[in-house]
Amino acid sequence: MNEKFHRIIFIIIAIAIAAVMFSLVGDYGSSIAEDEYQITQSIQLDRYYKSFGSDTSILQSSHPMYSGWFNALTVTMSDVFSKFEIRSVRHAMNALFGFVGILFAALLAKRCRNWRTASFTMLLLGFSPVIFGHSMFNLDDIPVFATFAASLYFAKRLADHFPKPKIIDAVFFALTSSLSIAANPDSSLIVAVALIICIIGLVAQRKHNEIKKAAIRYSIFAVCSLAVIFGIVILLIPQGISEWLGSFSPNAPTRILFEGKLFWTDLLPWYYNTKMLVMTIPAAVFVGMLLALGLCFVKKTNRAEIITFLVISVLAVLLFSLKSDTTGIWQHLLYAEIPLYIVSAIGFDMLVESSRTKATQIAGIAIPLLLMVMPAIHIFRCHPYSHIYYNEFTGGLSHAFGRYELENYGTSNREAAQWVIDNGKYNLSGNQLFVATRSEKAGKHYFGEYKYEVSIVETRWAERANHIWDYAIFPVTGIEPEILASKYFPQKNTVDTISIDNVPICLVLQRIDTCDLYGRGYLANNDVQNAIELLEMAVYNDPTNESAMINLIDANLRINNKDAMKKWIDRFLEIAPRDDVGNYYNAYYQNITGNNDEAERISKEIIEYNPRFSLAYMFLSMVYTLQKRYDEAENIILSTVDYDIYDEQAARQLVRVYNAQQKDISEAELSYYDYASKSYDRRGKKELAEKYKRLYEETKNKQ
C-alpha cells in the first residue's frame, strides 16, 4: 500500500482521536491544585502580561508556575468565551494542546520513517490512558508535552534540511523551545537534543562536499536560536531567572503512597520517577521498543533516530530524578515519554515492513492494535478517571491499590460533591449542611451554587473526627496503607464509593453519630470521664477512627491510667502500625514506664519513616538530655533544619540542652547558625546559607 493511502488512514485516526478527546473533556473534574491556586495565579499572570509588567501581584505567589504563559492564555480565552465557566475553557484548551502534542509526535515519526509509523504513533499516544487523561485537566504538564513534541519536530526538520537549514524551521524551533522551557525549565533539554540531532545529521553526511559550510550555517542558527529562546523566556517569566528557577523547588511537599509507604514528595527514592513511568506506560509501547531495538540492527535502518530518542528519554528522567530539589511528581515528566512512543511505533512499522506476505503484514498491523485494546477500553470504562492507570505488567489498579497513589489529583471531588447535592439529607446543625473535604477551596467551587445551604470544612482523613460535618468527601490519598488494606475499609458509614475497575478512589462518608466530636469537646474542657465514655463509643461505631483513639490515649494519660493508655495504643497501631502520632505516644509510654531503650528505638523509627514529624525529634532530644548524652541531644534537634522544621519549639529544646550543660545561650545560637549555614549550602540554598553564615559571624564577634 502506498504512502497516499497511509496518509488518509493517518488523517482518519487523527480526526477520530480529536473527536473523542473533545467529546469527553467536559466530564472531567478539576484538580485540587487548580482550585486552590492555579486559577488565581493564572489571573495574576494574565494581568502582568496585559499591564506590560506594571501589575506585579503575581510575584506574591509562592507556587511554581508550571505552564504559566498557557494558564494566562486560558484567562484571555475565557474572557472571549465568557458564556462558559473558566474551568471548562481551561480544560478544552488543555485537550487541544494534548492533541497538538500527539499530532506533532506523529508528524515527527513520519519524518523518521513514513505515514504508517505516524499512524502507529497517533494510536499509541492517543489511546495511552495517562496521556489521554492528563490532556483532559492537567494544565501543568500537557502544555510542556505539546511544545516539547513540536520542538523535537522542528529540530528534526533542521537536521533533515542538511546542508541548508531553513530559517522558518529555526524560527519555529526557537519559539516552541522557549514556550516549553518557560512552561517547565527541565525541558531545556530540548536545546541539547537539537544539538545532538544536528550533529548526527552532520556525521551521517561527513562525506558531503559542503560539510564545512553546513557546520558554519548550523552554528549560526544555533547561536541565533539560543538568543531568541533566552529572550522569549525572559519576556514570559515575571521574576528574575534565579527566582524563577527557585520557584520550581518544592516549597510545600506532601506525602504520597509509593511501594506501600508514605513518602514526602521531596524525599522519594531516586528511582521513583523511572518506576512510575514504566508502570503507567501501556505494555504495547515496550513491545514496540523491543522490536525497534532488535530490528534496527538487523535491517540497519533508523538506528540513529532510535538511539537518539532513547537517549533523550533516559537523560530527561535521570536529570529530573537526580535533582536535589525535585518535587518527585512523575507527571512532570510526561514530555519525556514522547520519544519512547515514537521508537515503539518505528518498531511496529519495521515488523510490518519485514513481513513477506500479505497475511503476515496484516498480523504485524494487528499486534499493536490488539495490545492497545485494553488501554483504550480503560479510557472509556474508567471515564472520567482514565489518567488513573497501571499497565498489564503491574497487575492493574487492583494490585496498585494500597501500594501506589491513585487519586492524588482529586478530580473525583466533582462526582462526590454532586452525590451530596443530590442525596444529602442528614443535617447536624439544623441550619447548614456541613461538608468536610481535603481542600476548602475545591469544596467551595463544587458547592458554589449552594453557599448559603452548605458550609465547607477542611480536614485530613486522620483528623476527620475532630471537626463538625454531616458528610465528608475523601479521595483515596494520604491514608495509611494498612488502613486501606484492613477489613474496616471502606468504613461502614460510607454512603457512596466512586470506583474504577472495582477499586475505590473516593469515599463519601455520612456522620452517623457525634460521640467523637463531643468526646473531644469534653476532653478540651478536661472532663476526662465523660470524654472517655463518648470516645469509646465512637471507636465502637468506627474501629478505624484514628482521632478518637488518639484522644482516648491522651485522656487516659491525663488520669495516669497507663494500662488503658497501652490498650488504646495497641488498638491504634493494629490498624496503623507506622502512624507517627500513634508511635509517638507509644514511645512516650515506654519512657514513662522506664523502658528508655525501646522509647529511643521507636522514636528513631518514627523519624526514619516520617522525617518531618517534629515531636519525635523533641522527645528524643529530651531523652538524650536526661541521660546526659548532650552531643546526641544537640545533633538530633539540629537535624530538624535539614527538613525545614526547625521552629520555636526546637529552639527552646536546644536551649534546654545547653542549660543542662550550664553553657551560655549564645553558644546554642552559634551552634544553630553554623549548622543551618552548612545545611542550606549542602542543599543548594545559597542565599539562606549566606544569611546564616553572616549571623554566625556577627554573633561570634559580639562575644
Regions found by a protein language model. Name each.
Residues 6, 11, 105-127, 164-168, ...:
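Transmembrane-helix signature of polytopic, membrane-embedded enzymes
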Residues 40-51, 63-68, 72, 79-83, ...:
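Transmembrane-lumen/periplasm boundary regions of multi-pass, lipid-linked membrane glycan transferases
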Residues 64, 68, 72, 80-100, ...:
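Loop-to-helix entry region of an early transmembrane alpha helix in multi-pass inner-membrane enzymes
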Residues 92-112, 150, 154:
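Transmembrane-helix motifs of polytopic, lipid-linked glycan transferases
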Residues 121-126, 153, 177, 181:
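Short helix- or helix-capping micro-motifs
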Residues 134, 140-145, 180, 189, ...:
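Hydrophobic/aromatic-rich transmembrane helices and adjacent perimembrane loops
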Residues 151-169:
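Membrane-interface transmembrane helices that cradle and orient dolichyl/undecaprenyl
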Residues 399-703:
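C-terminal luminal/periplasmic domains and tails of membrane-associated envelope-modifying transferases
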